[in-house]
Amino acid sequence: MQNKELIQHAAYAAIERILNEYFREENLYQVPPQNHQWSIQLSELETLTGEFRYWSAMGHHMYHPEVWLIDGKSKKITTYKEAIARILQHMAQSADNQTAVQQHMAQIMSDIDNSIHRTARYLQSNTIDYVEDRYIVSEQSLYLGHPFHPTPKSASGFSEADLEKYAPECHTSFQLHYLAVHQDVLLTRYVEGKEDQVEKVLYQLADIDISEIPKDFILLPTHPYQINVLRQHPQYMQYSEQGLIKDLGVSGDSVYPTSSVRTVFSKALNIYLKLPIHVKITNFIRTNDLEQIERTIDAAQVIASVKDEVETPHFKLMFEEGYRALLPNPLGQTVEPEMDLLTNSAMIVREGIPNYHADKDIHVLASLFETMPDSPMSKLSQVIEQSGLAPEAWLECYLNRTLLPILKLFSNTGISLEAHVQNTLIELKDGIPDVCFVRDLEGICLSRTIATEKQLVPNVVAASSPVVYAHDEAWHRLKYYVVVNHLGHLVSTIGKATRNEVVLWQLVAHRLMTWKKEYANNAVFVDCVEDLYQTPTIAAKANLMSKLNDCGANPIYTHIPNPICHNKEVSYCESNNS
């Protein structure tokens, strides 16, 4: 496809996301329309309209490409960007804080345009043969991004040249930039017993002998993009002039940027580094502040304490082992530290995939589930076909490998995993789910009630730790990340190809009832299962409203029909057109 066609395809994906967010957040089309039509009344005279290609019980709808604008008696096809702009203006006009939203509108449209153009560039990579092991390919082939985000691929700060060098969708790898930092100006923390291991692996990654580093200096890896940000920081410059930072330059093994962009993977050493980059990706500048790195290691300490007890051959937790960050002021000074330098230098080391090797069939779920707006097929469709199982049997196996251990972990320990589709990996054997891996502990939390009962609080982490939440909030977060984001995406992806999504939700409900009987002596587990089975609605992030209100850090939630509960009541219909 030519560049113009790629941009058109990217814009098609963008309007699909905007429509799905709008309908979810406005509680529209919660049952399939009999005439397969959708419409948005913009004003007394103007209406946007089009046709569903596929209706999804979880809201992952697909659409025919034509979007019509009806203005009085005239009807014409409008562009995707024009349709998006009109939907956003319509939402802004009905917002409580209309003036603030209108002032923010230009930036929102700029971010959407940025996301569309970035997506078009990444789709170009999708047409090129890419020779790597399947796991690396999976991490680097999430071309469209979050299905319920208005700007899933926006990246403000990266130039076009930076994209080519550092964006995972461009199928790249690169060496890191290393600093030797005096211990007096470096903040460090490690999971108990992991400091020596972190030290060893970082020297291996840098291909630097410890004898080359002066006494009392510690190795600090940085992203090659970020080193230029640090060099402009006054405190960094002062440290360099004082000889407290020695620039070692680019060195060592190449690493692969993963789907999160800032986290990189060393295939040679099977280790992840979560590195700060001062780039706004979707809603946030992707740096690591003090609370984030502290809660990450608190969470890792909890996981380390229960890992042997809760892991099975088919369920693994990948935890962070430690962090290193530049201090804004030398130790001993009483000046309140200015956290910007720490935030822009704090890096976290995460353990790799257990028993990893390049021949294994491991995928990050997000790219496995991704469908293009003009096709119901996905990599997941290919996997299920390869397995030889019926989709229902494949899903049942998947639930046993993922949802069941996640619910058991929560009910037995209070650990609420942020197991969304970019944090979860699945290892397949002949296309059949075999091992589930959950990573990135920054977002996990603990139910104060359960964790206190199990003595994780205060024996492992203090009750005041940012990782400790009220029980209801911990359960709320698990339901969103695991059921709405993860399971909802999975079931709808299978449903797009098989046209039986509601039947699949019936299977999920049946599995929950089976587990309820099997684990009837676990009161918390039974309560969780009954909540999923009986509660008519479930909370989902309202990313479009949050974007309009500029509150991504504290997102708005909306309540949507719970397809597990409604699976027997919701009728299913689809367009005969494909």
From Swiss-Prot:
EC number: 6.3.2.54
Disulfide bonds: none
Gene3D superfamilies: 1.10.510.40, 6.10.250.3370
Keyword line: ATP-binding, Ligase, Nucleotide-binding
Alphabetical GO biological process terms: siderophore biosynthetic process
Entry keyword DNA repair: no
Highest rank taxon of the organism: Bacteria
Name of this protein: L-2,3-diaminopropanoate--citrate ligase
Lineage: Bacteria, Bacillati, Bacillota, Bacilli, Bacillales
